[in-house]
């Protein structure tokens, strides 16, 4: 390995089982090595339907005979907190979204056929927040405190054949605050019931790496873990077949050996792929590895794994390289909530997030600050995102009163093990993060006695030199860092390990350990140019940048005045507007503007890229404000999924598509001085016109990624024209809007899948008589749905709104709001009607079709 360069040859894909969406991927059933007509005994069923739920505790609900007839019937995934009211009294605080917590119980009754006696049944949870305990027929199967980890239990010894079985789950999210952002409450990710024969591939039981790759061939290393849960030793053959995207076999191998009773055995194999198609950002090509376990002519198991082949390296001088091409990671950080849907996982909602980001030019996701839903990584595999996969937000030292720190010593190895095994086959995952802004960076940093808001802020200000590691010192915190990195490398030596650090000094205990492969800074732009000198031969990435603050649709002038909010971390901050300007002139004291980071990354080859804080607004952490603010201002896109103006800055810098974005709106007081900004690309110059009169030609330069004019408002039109070599290539016009007159409904899709889960996100706009958006409209819009659909949620992107997310009405916020329609599980049409007092109503029809 070259000094200062980390080179990696990767990699496999996410784990696929049975016939539905599996842990991290799509489910398929494919043959391998021999007759594809042989049926695998493996089945994996969606176990989300028809649960009963009760919010409250003190029950004997674990017992199978408990009467739950009056409990609510619902389908998972489910987040009970998002259904509640915002309140200053909720112990989650504004940092946790000011939504309720509590204890909840879930119960499901099911039966298993006696013909399946001898099969192995497991219940698999993708994530339960938090402190879950699972019971089958009154028997406790175990507890899992960490709310972001996937886990499973063996049901087999406790099942009753041809009789009712009762699965009960207690979820305890009563002790709060336990998170610095909105966590959600309940079984908020998918649940699966798997059935296998006694000899089968273990959970997350394949591991695919690439030992070499060039244009002619790639050599894949396979490790398959088999479990023999029978009473006898068995001679088996593991057949591994790699298939291309069209289902054609491109490589095959087989190995035979003995699987001892009651034990696991690992089969190692190698495949050679001729003329491999590489996984890349723009062409995320996926193969499928089909693993078949045979005993003579009997198929004991069939298991599939999507595989992506690619190479990447991180270099201390040249940054990030993917498949031999120097590439900047243009990434964003993302928390896990889905706006008005809360934490409850929905594949289409996650896909929408990623589509909006991809259109912006984003190519990277940082999973902040916890293991993500498997569906997110599966989508990143298929859509071409570079993922920084993160394990923890805290280690032993807590950031909030009741967070994971109290479980860390007992549970971190188990959780880290399950996290790495689950995610290590995803081609999108290129780096592990073992922590974010952990207090172990310093010798003695405690947040025990601070409020949640103060704890968030103290993390991002400097600490005295006495709290840093001394030269040659091997502190407890450095030793813990070494332990965690060693643990990760033992499970996956193919990827680098980093941590998001907000102490840039080389005396940072994590840095002093010497084991982090990549130096990662959260913020501290002024220190970044010194990284090559302070950390020679270490690759570098900005793990978190900016923390710029914006409210969609709100503008504070003059735009060249910078607002640094909050003014002090130890004092409460308030501004009567509870808003932040969209001019790129407001950020936190430890952060910076979007333009500053874009230029820094552009001008320094050693910077591998950045993950902007954040791609979307999220519930909770409403910095710089406290109550009644309850969601963030950090996003490039607001909570409802509406891009803020800065979205088009990134689009102009990160893509080659034509961009011409003029803002703000053109509804002001006559004679008022207005700052008009423009983001553009693919042009030499832009010229602004007010009612046909030129306001001058402007050109960007290396120091300014936007242009601006200060003009006096007069009703009419403001227009910008972009020219390339003197030729007009684009133009944008904004008209002064009149009084609100009508509603416009715009769906993101007109045809849904009739699966009971698919969603249509409908943008609701208030227009004047001429069809212009009314930029200050706040009309209350009422919704009704008839036919095959229902309202899954409503939003408008307002961080201060006290309106419920689960409702049939929403006020417009700067002219817009959102209604989300969910299919009811049947094919047909749903008719959405939107009404508002004094406005013409709008009607939209949405179709749903069977797969």
UniProtKB/Swiss-Prot annotation:
UniProt-annotated catalytic positions: 437 (proton donor), 544 (nucleophile)
Keywords (A to Z) from UniProt: Carbohydrate metabolism, Cell inner membrane, Cell membrane, Glycosidase, Hydrolase, Lipoprotein, Membrane, Palmitate, Polysaccharide degradation, Signal
Range of residues in the leader sequence: 1-19
GO molecular function: beta-galactosidase activity
EC number: 3.2.1.23
First-level EC class: hydrolase
A biological process term (GO) from this entry: symbiotic process benefiting host
Cysteine pairs bridged by disulfides in the record: none
Record localization: Cell inner membrane
Any further remark recorded for this protein: Gut bacteria supply the human body with energy from dietary polysaccharides through glycosidases that are absent in the human genome. Xyloglucans are a ubiquitous family of highly branched plant cell wall polysaccharides present in the vegetables we consume. Enzymes involved in xyloglucan degradation mediate the conversion of otherwise indigestible plant polysaccharides to short-chain fatty acids.
Protein name: Beta-galactosidase BoGH2A
Species the sequence originates in: Bacteroides ovatus (strain ATCC 8483 / DSM 1896 / JCM 5824 / BCRC 10623 / CCUG 4943 / NCTC 11153)
